[in-house]
Amino acid sequence: MNSENALLQSDILAYLEQHEQKDMLRFLTCGSVDDGKSTLIGRLLHDSKMIYEDQLAAITKDSKKSGTTGDKVDLALLVDGLASEREQGITIDVAYRYFSTDKRKFIIADTPGHEQYTRNMVTGASTCDLAIILVDARAGVKTQTRRHSFLVSLLGIKHVIVAINKMDLMEFSEEVYENIKKDYLVFSEQLDIPDIQFVPISALDGDNVVNKSENTPWFEGSTLMKTLENIEIGNDANIDDFRFPVQYVNRPNLNFRGFAGTVVSGQIKKGDKITALPSGKQSTVRSIVGFEGEQEVAYTPLTTTITLEDEIDISRGDMIVKSDNLPLQSSAYEVNLVWMDETPLMPNKQYGFKFATKFVPGSVTDIEHQIDVNTMEHKEAVRLNLNEIGVGKIKLTQSVACDPYTKNRETGAFIIIDRLTNSTVGAGMVIDAIQDSGTKTEYSEFELEFNTLVRKHFPHWNATDITKL
């Protein structure tokens, strides 16, 4: 039992107050098959004293049936929750685990290492601040390592810890560690990952995971847990660009009209000049109302309600920004695309696009190229299949305000929705806006009448009014 659990049992109020003050780090583990991702998470939980006795007894029993570690307790069984995963000894789903230490709270996403589960990894990585990339000390930097690193870079994760695992099988050789470190740094020069750190570990035995290992006297860095506790992520937040997607109009009575939502980046204070998009109408912040009443300032990631001096038309899906700091605004964008559905992405097919709180119909008009996630080569493509990634152009039925994903992960991301099944079939990241050409398609009388007929008698098809395209 760690000190936190002891405090929890003795003084629940003191525990809650202490817990409330900690910041949170979201991170994912990724690596090739059998690199030890689930074992590492189990080791972090075990050595941090975050496993209860009944859990330990259960996995000790299960280790004899499903374990892969001989006489040792298979800590990977703490995370591999699905029966099919245990039987195959692999991770399929994205498994989330929550734990905390005296310094920080953590959410771990254990993501699949297989290429056919790329969409699962993208889902797990989309909300993370840091990635732990496991490398098998016996194999070094492999194709899968490059693929995972590319995906981490694509999704805007700025901090990477390369955990060189199974060092016990290489007799904790410093030469092996340095060679892998050198190979990875050479490869990573073509990626946008500003902070890369390395740790030699043995997840099975716990070397350099939570406790410093006596087997690596040549390693002067911190253990994996200490690195996770001390890494600074506060500077990653976008505090310059105020973006406030409106979730709903809050009107409890005739005397109050506010706009509720989450500050996804930046900050706002009373008296600031704002612009509502897409209308472009301007006003001034009258008040900011939070859970405990009025406040002078609101900043990311607070959920709040903003009232304005002027009665301007704002509804769900609109975005409130500072008048002197406007985002991109266009109905056409160049984007990175990740396809997540078994039915391929087909250009010019109508989909739904969801940017923050705004839903707008549109289509992918062009696939410029597909990106080979293993080699990062660009290939010609006329469609994207399940788990494939590409660069393309989207055309929306109305203008949408957003930022490049590299500048703002919250307003630069979107999901693609199948309008018949309402399932999420893809995800995207904005690269840049494409200026509208101003040309308008001419439709025949028959096309106009047919479009009107479909929208009138088959509203569940969600057909777009082509006169507004």
Swiss-Prot record:
The tr-type G domain extends over 22-236
Q: Where is this region: G4?
A: 165-168
Quote the pathway field.
Sulfur metabolism; hydrogen sulfide biosynthesis; sulfite from sulfate: step 1/3
Q: Where is this region: G3?
A: 110-113
Q: Does the keyword Nucleotide-binding apply?
A: yes
Positions of GTP binding: 31-38, 110-114, 165-168
GO BP terms, alphabetized = hydrogen sulfide biosynthetic process; sulfate assimilation
Q: Which SUPFAM superfamilies match?
A: EF-Tu/eEF-1alpha/eIF2-gamma C-terminal domain (SSF50465), P-loop containing nucleoside triphosphate hydrolases (SSF52540), Translation proteins (SSF50447)
Q: What reaction is this protein's catalytic activity? A: sulfate + ATP + H(+) = adenosine 5'-phosphosulfate + diphosphate
Which cysteines does the record link by disulfide bonds?
none
**EC main group:** transferase
| Segments of this protein annotated with the region G1 | 31-38
In residue numbers, the region (G5) covers 202-204
Q: Does the keyword Nucleotidyltransferase apply?
A: yes
| Cited CDD domains | CysN_ATPS, CysN_NodQ_II, CysN_NoDQ_III
Pfam family membership, one: GTP_EFTU
EC no. given is 2.7.7.4
Region of interest (G2), ranges: 89-93
Q: Name one GO molecular function term.
A: GTP binding
* Protein task: With CysD forms the ATP sulfurylase (ATPS) that catalyzes the adenylation of sulfate producing adenosine 5'-phosphosulfate (APS) and diphosphate, the first enzymatic step in sulfur assimilation pathway. APS synthesis involves the formation of a high-energy phosphoric-sulfuric acid anhydride bond driven by GTP hydrolysis by CysN coupled to ATP hydrolysis by CysD.
PANTHER family on file: TRANSLATION FACTOR
Quaternary structure and interacting proteins, as annotated:
Heterodimer composed of CysD, the smaller subunit, and CysN.
- Similarity-based family: Belongs to the TRAFAC class translation factor GTPase superfamily. Classic translation factor GTPase family. CysN/NodQ subfamily.
Q: What protein name applies here? A: Sulfate adenylyltransferase subunit 1
Species of the source = Pseudoalteromonas atlantica (strain T6c / ATCC BAA-1087)
Q: Which gene encodes it?
A: cysN
